[in-house]
Design a protein with these regions (language model features):
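Structural detector for hydrophobic anchor residues on beta-strands
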Residues: 45, 101-103, 123
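Short, acidic Ser/Thr/Gly-rich low-complexity loop/linker segments typical of extracellular
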Residues: 79-80, 84-108
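C-terminal motif of bacterial Sec signal peptides marking the signal peptidase cleavage site
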Residues: 12-15
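A short, solvent-exposed beta-strand micro-motif common in secreted/extracellular proteins
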Residues: 119-133
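Positively charged n-region of N-terminal signal peptides that target proteins for export
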Residues: 1-4
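Short, surface-exposed beta-strand/beta-hairpin micro-motifs centered on an aromatic residue
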Residues: 108-115
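Primarily secretory-pathway and cell-envelope proteins
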Residues: 17-85, 130-164
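Sec-dependent N-terminal signal peptides
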Residues: 6-9
């Protein structure tokens, strides 16, 4: 009897656990598409990344990485499936990081990229903060990824606001 009760209890607890949704595989890395991207340029991209809370507070991307990800079939897949449809994707092919330009946002969520090649990019960062819940003072992470698609021409100096 005790073994049956224990087994029933374990099964009940296991059924309460939430499972993460399965990750969606990505397309094959389009190496030729990436190899054809310009490696250097003269444009400047600067801007600010933030989110507003429901209460109207502004939360900055202070200290977070900001990336310029060239628009390709591979990054478009990420944009459509992950950013728009909120579907979990497997980790990207590590070769993609050779083509992404990175910087760090300052304390006001401002960022700047120099010597950017002409092309289309996703400017992407994370803006997150913790807020109290109704569960004994526990904190919950809020916010998330923000991204904006931009077009950069040679010699441009453009200002971008990245938010929802």
């Amino acid at each position: 009897m005790k073994k049956s009760a224990l087994l029933l209890f374990v099964c009940f607890i296991a059924s309460c656990a939430t499972m993460a949704p399965p990750q969606i595989s990505r397309m094959a890395f389009p190496e030729n598409e990436y190899q054809n991207l310009a490696k250097s340029g003269s444009a400047v991209v600067k801007g600010q990344a933030f989110l507003k809370t429901r209460g109207g507070d502004v939360k900055m991307a202070a200290g977070n990485d900001v990336i310029l990800n060239p628009v390709t079939s591979y990054s478009n897949e990420w944009y459509e499936k992950y950013y728009i449809q909120s579907k979990p994707l497997v980790e990207p092919d590590s070769r993609v990081w050779n083509y992404v330009i990175r910087t760090v946002a300052d304390g006001s969520g401002r960022f700047i990229f120099k010597n950017v090649p002409a092309g289309q990019y996703f400017v992407t960062t994370f803006v997150t903060w913790e807020a109290p819940t109704d569960y004994g003072g526990a904190l919950q992470v809020q916010g998330g990824t923000v991204t904006k698609r931009i077009t950069v021409n040679e010699g441009d100096e453009i200002e971008v606001i990245v938010t929802h």
